[in-house]
Curated annotation (Swiss-Prot):
Species annotation: Francisella philomiragia subsp. philomiragia (strain ATCC 25017 / CCUG 19701 / FSC 153 / O#319-036)
Gene assigned in the entry: rplO
Protein name: Large ribosomal subunit protein uL15
Example GO BP: translation
Function per UniProt: Binds to the 23S rRNA.
Compositional bias (Gly residues): 21-31
Amino acid sequence: MKLNTIAPAAGSKSAPKRLGRGIGSGLGKTSGKGHKGQKARSGGYHKVGFEGGQMPIQRRLPKFGFTSASKRYVAEIRLHELNGLALEEVTVDTLKDSGLIRKDIKSVKIIASGEIQKAVSLKGIACTKGAKEAIEKAGGKVE
């Protein structure tokens, strides 16, 4: 194989539409743009969301809610994810070291999703009522 012999697969490329090249082409005269109007002009189009002067939907509907910036630094961990850890004592730092949470996370909450088979001790980690019951049932403790 040589560089000058490389070609795309047969049928994978189509010839570009040749606009304004006579009636027989099917795209002559107005080149598929119809007659007159803003969209027929060169450079003529509207902004995204423009509705012809009518008040656009993004301005008709009210604003609501906001995103808390502190939420970015709180992680949720499911109960069954603790099974994969080779740790008896679980803290925020040990979770960071194991790669279960990002390094910039400041606090963690365990939620009762799935089951836990091993006894673990949680230190400085919040958990839901159901998760606490499951951890204590498995022989672990929450501090």
